[in-house]
Curated annotation (Swiss-Prot):
Official protein name in the record: F-box protein At1g70360
Alphabetical list of PROSITE patterns matching this protein: FBOX (PS50181)
Family matches, as InterPro entries: F-box-like_dom_sf, F-box_dom
Gene3D superfamilies for this protein: 3.40.1000.30
F-box domain sequence ranges: 136-174
Pfam families: F-box (PF00646)
Amino acid sequence: MEESGDTCELTIVIMTVHAVMLESGFVLFDPDSSMRFSFSKKTLVSLNYTLPSVKGIVGLNFEKEAIVGSFVRVVSIDKRSYVHIVDLLMETLKSDEEEDTLSIDCKVLVWWRMIKDGIVTPLLVDLCYKTGLELPPCFISLPRELKHKILESLPGVDIGTLACVSSELRDMAS
């Protein structure tokens, strides 16, 4: 990626999204050779993923140009929307103070959740829905009205705790 004029920030964004995709059960897929676990030789800023038991493909594009092909869904990730977070993480990592360790862990967790909640889980739900697979057991796959009913039945303390889990729950809890 560095050879293609990439910056450190783009590398961090791509590697983080890639790690969250793998952690969620996705595998890399090269649509040209129909091989799994393969990086495309054309470009490393457009990655294609699938699930082990699925033929559908989701594409992630880290550039502005469109991806053409037979994808279930394509997501374009604008690195500029994540660069400020990467800069914050890099700044915190440079600190030598021990008390910053908790701060670093917290920021990395927030970064991970942001990628998981905003990109990966919606892709997973969409791919499962469109290919007929059973949806993953997650709150996000429930209809909005049902989510509201569930939240209404919870005590305020529990709603406050749920609001810390994801941005979607935080928005719903407010």
